[in-house]
Amino acid sequence: MPKYYEEKEEEKHPCGGVKEDLKNCLLQSDCVLQEGKSPKECLKEGYCKALQVTFFECKRSILDNRARFRGRKGY
């Protein structure tokens, strides 16, 4: 289950939960903790790729007129 659901209020921003999970994934990755790299560098190297794709799809679905009827992608 995504971590942002536990003991939190409803997000006001679209895709906020996916963004928070992506941030937590990057900050808890070995790339940041052990190698001391920035989260941006780790994202370029491919860490948390699934959440990155989910966040991109969610942001894209906001702009896609067809997806407005179907609802946003993501959680």
Curated annotation (Swiss-Prot):
GO terms for biological process: mitochondrial cytochrome c oxidase assembly. A motif (Cx9C motif) lies at residues 48-58. Disulfide bonds join C31-C58, C42-C48. Residues 28-66 form the CHCH domain. A motif (Cx10C motif) lies at residues 31-42. Keywords: Disulfide bond. PROSITE patterns: CHCH. GO terms for cellular component: mitochondrion. PANTHER family: CYTOCHROME C OXIDASE ASSEMBLY FACTOR 5. Belongs to the PET191 family. Involved in an early step of the mitochondrial complex IV assembly process. This is Cytochrome c oxidase assembly factor 5. The lineage of its organism: Eukaryota, Metazoa, Chordata, Craniata, Vertebrata.
